[in-house]
Amino acid sequence: MALRTVLVSDVPSLPDSVYGLSEGLELSKPTSFRLPGFSVIGHRGIGMNVLQSSDRRARGVKENSILSFNSAAKYPIDFIEFDVQVTKDDCPVIFHDDFIYSEENGIVNESRVTDLSLSEFLLYGPQKETEKIGKTLMRKSKEGKVLKWDVDLDDSLCTLQEAFEQVEQTLGFNIELKFDDQTVYEREFLVHILRSVLQVVSNYAKDRPVIFSSFQPDAAKLVRELQSTYPVFFLTDAGNEIHNDERRNSLEEAIQVCLEGGLQGIVSEVKGVFRNPAAISKIKESNLSLLTYGKLNNVGEAVYMQYVMGIDGVIVDFVEEIIESTTRMMIRPPPSSSPLPSPSKDDDVAITRPEFSQKEISFLLKLLSQLIQH
């Protein structure tokens, strides 16, 4: 992707507070970051919405909403993940899709989120002032069908500032910086957008743990150049989808992006890791953290396998179920009768990675690789 060169020194500086270290994050040097143990991270809060799904959990709480974030905060998780875009009047808002849809008099209207002002964006869906009626919020599925965005527990759209102000303070934010896959961005534009986000983070994050991530490799590198407080992860499909930008097509390319940009880690589609488990050791040798996302992360056994493999954390939709299943699988079995002193109660529930032989791990990985082909 060709970008016009702009010296970072020419970019207006952010407040000094942006450059301080945030408590709770082990960020000892530009390419070193570790999460506090194996982390379960709530996807778009308590889980993403799939409107056509027969599984009620996929239509439980409005994704990327304050209600969803605080619902996730009720569980013992370290972070939630959500998507941030910037409106045309420079306000960071939380919304996943590139386009937003509404219906009026039987006609479906489409708008690009970043072409809307903040006030226009907030007109969609339930309104904070209950006496007001917002535009009927619709969503376009991957199959191209436009559906009414119906969930059991709805909530209004929100800004990044509101999330910092209204979500449980101890819950970390994994902020995905959203950009259109089909657009080639000039460096100046990326800098402008990222500064809008960083300004809000600087003003409102306080001591909250924050991780930035992006599928856009130039944006990921730039946010690292513009601040040294918070870790930056590069998101990759790891070959599950092929993009024109080759940097997005493999874990090996993702490692290179991180090393070139001084990033702290990779967030990979989980099937890409299971297909290429050898990349895990390369990632660790490069002093990078590794998180995963994807549908398989809603299966407890697949999450546990990643824990065994040394992956640092998983982004999941079914937060309650995955927390319960992984806790059961990771709890040390009760001690047998023995004249030796009993371990403390805390030791009984200590999470320890089990020991598997290389042959056993290879067999499990081969089995997983075969399963995900179907």
Curated annotation (Swiss-Prot):
It is an enzyme of class 3 (hydrolase). One of its GO terms (biological process) is lipid metabolic process. PROSITE patterns: GP_PDE (PS51704). Induction: By phosphate starvation. Signal peptide: none annotated. Its EC number is 3.1.4.46. Keywords: Glycerol metabolism, Hydrolase. One of its GO terms (molecular function) is glycerophosphodiester phosphodiesterase activity. Pfam families: GDPD. Expressed in roots, shoots, flowers and siliques. It catalyses: a sn-glycero-3-phosphodiester + H2O = an alcohol + sn-glycerol 3-phosphate + H(+). Residues 330-349 are annotated as: Disordered. It comes from the Eukaryota. SUPFAM superfamilies: PLC-like phosphodiesterases. This is Glycerophosphodiester phosphodiesterase GDPD2.
